[in-house]
């Protein structure tokens, strides 16, 4: 969920809001490809890098935003229609900043979809269930109420291509 939140934050981020990922739909089959490329270093020498990366990636991300209550100084900016409109315009234009899928060499594209497309889009995993076990879910950053930085790992299951990120009723570990 943290990586998907990074994609959404690249499209529109303000300290007034916190983007929350609800679910992701994995449209294409999960496939990998390996390849090598020559990297040019800052001292103008070159090296060979070998990479294994996901290929043919297509995710549909369902999310919402909430007010950042850790910033009471921004209460005057809590206008739901304003932020919804800016987010929608940003998504329709492909986001505000480049989206990276892991590292800078893997740039992603963003486009706006509506609820109808999210629910009707077929996936390679329709009718199947895959248990991924425990996976990294998100970070809990220190704030006024919590003093420690925590990593959250949750038991992740994909049902018909959809992974839900709501932790209610889901087994998770805090580290």
Describe each model-derived feature in a short phrase.
Residues 37-175:
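Internal, well-folded beta-alpha domain core
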């Amino acid at each position: 969920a943290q990586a998907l939140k990074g994609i959404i934050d690249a499209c529109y981020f303000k300290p007034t809001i916190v983007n929350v990922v609800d679910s992701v739909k994995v449209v294409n089959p999960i496939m990998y490809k390996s390849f090598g490329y020559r990297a040019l270093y800052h001292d103008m020498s070159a090296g060979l890098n070998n990479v294994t990366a996901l290929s043919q990636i297509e995710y549909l991300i369902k999310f919402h935003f909430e007010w950042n209550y850790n910033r009471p100084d921004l209460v005057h900016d809590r206008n739901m229609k304003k932020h919804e409109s800016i987010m929608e315009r940003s998504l329709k234009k492909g986001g505000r900043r480049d989206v990276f899928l892991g590292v800078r060499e893997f740039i992603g594209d963003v486009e706006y979809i509506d609820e109808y497309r999210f629910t009707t889009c077929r996936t390679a995993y329709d009718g199947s269930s895959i248990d991924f076990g425990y996976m990294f879910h998100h970070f809990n950053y220190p704030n006024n109420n919590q003093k420690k930085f925590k990593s959250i790992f949750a038991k992740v299951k994909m049902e018909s291509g959809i992974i839900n990120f709501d932790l209610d009723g889901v087994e998770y570990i805090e580290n």
